[in-house]
Amino acid sequence: MKSKERKSRKRWITDWWPNRLNLKILRQNCSDSNPYGSDYDYLKEVKTLDVDAVIEDLKKLMKTSQDWWPADFGHYGPLFIRLSWHSAGSYRIHDGRGGAKNGSIRFPARINWPDNINLDKAIRLLWPIKKKYGKKLSWADLIILAGTVALQDMGVKILGFSLGREDVFEADESPDWGAEQEMLSGKERFKEGELEKPFAATEMGLIYVNPEGPMGNPDPSGSAKEIRLAFTRMGMNDEETVALIAGGHSFGKCHGAGPSKDLGPDPSSSPIEQMGLGWKYTYKTGKASDTYTSGFEVIWSSKPTKFGIQYLKFLLEFEWELEKSPDGKNQWVAKNAPEMIPDPFDPNKKHKPRMLTADLALKFDPIYSKIAKKFLENPEEFEKAFAWAWFKLTHRDMGPKSCYIGPYVPREEFIWQDPLPKRDYELIDEEDIEYLKKQILNSGINISQLVYTAWSSASTYRDSDRRGGANGARIRLRPMNLWEVNHPDDLIKIIKVYEKIQKNFNEEQKNNKKVSIADLIVLGGCAAIESAAKKAGFDIRVPFIPGRVDALQDQVEEEFYREIEPFADGFRNYFKDPYKIDESDISTTPEYFLIDKAQLLKLTVPELVVIVGGLRVLGAVYSYKNYGVLTHTVGTLTNDFFVNLLDMNIEWKQIDEHRYLFEGFNRKTKEPEFKATRVDLIFAHHDELRAVAEVYASDDEKEKFVSDFIKTWDKVMTLDRFDLKV
C-alpha cells in the first residue's frame, strides 16, 4: 500500500481524555524553561540597574510617536497606563493569581483577551527599552514601571515604585479564568445567580466589568453593582475604586473608529507574518484616528495627557444622553455641551465630552457619588488617593515589603503587605533549639498534632501573591484561628502550650534572647518528624532556622483572611462540600483542588506525592479520623501509605453517596483494613502520580522517602522566609 502524506490533525492526550487530572501546572516555569539558566538571579541583577536612566529613556520613548502605531495626542503615556493596569488588574484575592508579578500578560490567555486589544502594540513599543537593559530589567517590572512613569510624566505625584518582579517564559496555566466557551460571556460564572469564586471579572476576557453595562445593558446602577463586586474581589474598597477609575480615566481615550467586523484575530491566532501582533484592523488605515480597541469612541477630558479633576467635573456636572458609537455600542454624550475635547490627531477637530456606562456608575451609585464629590472638592486628596490606590494595584501581589527593591520603595507599610514587627531580640542557638525540642515533645502534644499545627501554619502561604505562611504565626489570630480546617478548639489548647513554653524560656534568659510562637510552631513540627523518623530507624536532622516573629492582631488583614479560608485542602484531607462533587467535571473534585494548592506552594509532582504520603502516616489529617492514614504505626515516618495504597490485596469500595469516602477491604478475609478519601486514591488511580508513588513504595527507597519528605517539609516551612533570601 502506498503511504499517504498526513493531513489529519494530531489529537493530544487532553483531547481524548479532557477530564483527566492535569499535572502540568506543577511542571510549568521550571528552571529549564528559563533561557538565562538555573544560575541566573534576577533579584541580584536588578539591583545593579540604573533606574533613573530607565526612567529617562521611558519618558523620551513616550513622546516619540512611531509611524507603525502613532501615539494619541503625541504621548504613549495613556497606552502604557492601560498596559500596567491590565497587567496588574487581573489579580483576584481568592487565589492571588493574575496580577503583574511575573509578566504573564505577554502570553495567552491574557494577551488574547478582548479587554487587552492592542496591548500587544504597547509591549512592542517597550521592546527597545527591554533590549537595552536585558537581563537587568524584567518585562514584568518594565510593564509596571512604564505606566508609573507615564503617570509621573503627566502630573501625578506617585507614592513610589518597587522592582523585583521575575519574568516567566511560558504561559501560566494555573489560573482558572472560567468555563465560558466564548469571550465576553458570563453565563457560567453567574450560573447560580452569584459570581463564583475565584472570579473577579464579570465576563470572560475582561479584567473587571463590561464598560457598556451588565451584559451590554446601559444601566449605570447595575454597572455600579458589578464594579463593586469585581473591585471587592480584587481587594479594593469603594474609595480606592473611585480613585482608580477617576484617576485612570483622566488620561487618553477609547477607540472604536469603525465596525468590529473589520478587526482581525488575536495575537495567538494571527497570521505568522504579523510576527505575534494581533487585532489587525482593515478599516481605512487601521491606526491613529482609524483605530479599534474597545468599540467605544470616548475621550473623558479636554487635557487627556495631564492629570486633574476634569473627569470628575464633567461626570458630575453634565447631564448625559445615551448614544451609539460608530461600532453601535452604547456610550454617553454630554447633553448641551460644547465641542471642547481635542482630537488626538487633527488639531482642527473638537469633540463633546463622552462617558461609558461604567463611568456613570460613579455618578448614580449613592456611595460612589459621595466619594466622587469629595474628590472633586478636594483635588489634593483625590491625587493622593489615586497615587496610593495605583501603588496598591501594581504592587499587591509582590508580597511583604522585604521583597521590594530599588531607590523608590516608599517608607510606608500597608496591611496588604502582611507587615510584621521588627525583631528586637537575639535568636536562639543550636543548644536552645535542642532544649526547646525536648520541652515540646514532653508537653503532651502528640506527633500528629505537632505536625498538623506546623503544616497548617506554613501551608497558608501562596506564591501567587506571596501572602500567608508560618512567619507571623497568624494561625493563632483572628480569623485563621477560627478556620474549620485548623481545628479551632484543638488549636487554642496547643497555642496555650506553646505560649507557656515561650514564657518559661524567655524568662530564664539572662541576655536579650527570645523565641517566638511562630518559631515554636515550626520547631514543634520538626521535632515531631525527627521523633517519627527515629521510630522508623532513621536518625536524621530536620532543618530549622530561627528568625520568625509574631504578628499582632492589628497587622492581620482580617477581611482578606476570611475570604481565603479554604473549603478544600487535600494535604490535610479536608473537603467542606462533598455534595458538590461531579465526576464528569474534574474541577469539582478535591483532587483537582489538591493540585491547585500544590501549585500555590511551589511543589513539583514528586514533592506533592512524598509530602502527602508523609503527612498521612504521621496522622496529620483533618479531625484525626484516620482517613488516608494507611498504616498501623501512626506517628512513625514509614512509606506505609504508598505500600498499602498500591497493595492489590486491598479492594476499595465507595462508602458515601458523594463518592468522596472509601474503605479498603482485604480481598481474602473481606475485613476492612483502611479508610481513605478520593485524594488518597488518586495517587494510585492517576498514572503519573502512581508512577511516583511506586518509587516511594519500593523496598529499597525507604530512606529516600524519609529524606525527600524532610526536604519538601523544609521547603514549605521556609516559603515565606524572605529574610533568608535577601
From Swiss-Prot:
Locate the cross-link: Tryptophyl-tyrosyl-methioninium (Tyr-Met) (with W-85): Y208-M234
Q: Name the CDD domains on file.
A: catalase_peroxidase_1, catalase_peroxidase_2
* PROSITE patterns reported for this sequence: PEROXIDASE_1, PEROXIDASE_2, PEROXIDASE_4
Q: How does it assemble?
A: Homodimer or homotetramer.
Species of origin? Pseudothermotoga lettingae (strain ATCC BAA-301 / DSM 14385 / NBRC 107922 / TMO) (Thermotoga lettingae)
Q: Which GO terms describe its cellular component?
A: cytosol
**Which E.C. number(s) belong to this protein?**
1.11.1.21
Give the GO terms filed under biological process for this record. Answer: cellular response to hydrogen peroxide; hydrogen peroxide catabolic process
Write out the PTM section of this UniProt entry.
Formation of the three residue Trp-Tyr-Met cross-link is important for the catalase, but not the peroxidase activity of the enzyme.
Extract the Pfam families matched here. peroxidase
Q: Does the keyword Nucleus apply?
A: no
The name on file for this protein is Catalase-peroxidase
Annotated site residues (Transition state stabilizer) in this chain: R82
Active-site residue numbers: H86 (proton acceptor)
Q: Which reaction does it catalyse?
A: H2O2 + AH2 = A + 2 H2O; 2 H2O2 = O2 + 2 H2O
What does the UniProt record say this protein does? Answer: Bifunctional enzyme with both catalase and broad-spectrum peroxidase activity.
Q: Provide this UniProt record's keywords sorted from A to Z.
A: Heme, Hydrogen peroxide, Iron, Metal-binding, Oxidoreductase, Peroxidase
What is the free-text note on the cofactor? Binds 1 heme b (iron(II)-protoporphyrin IX) group per dimer.
Which residues does the record give as heme b binding sites?
A: H249
Which cofactor is essential here?
A: heme b
| Family annotation (HAMAP family) | Catal_peroxid
Under the heading SUPFAM superfamilies, the entry gives: Heme-dependent peroxidases
Q: Tell me the protein family, please.
A: Belongs to the peroxidase family. Peroxidase/catalase subfamily.
Q: Which domain of life is it from?
A: Bacteria
Instruction: State where the record puts the cross-link Tryptophyl-tyrosyl-methioninium (Trp-Tyr) (with M-234).
Output: W85-Y208
* Gene Ontology MF annotations: catalase activity; heme binding; metal ion binding
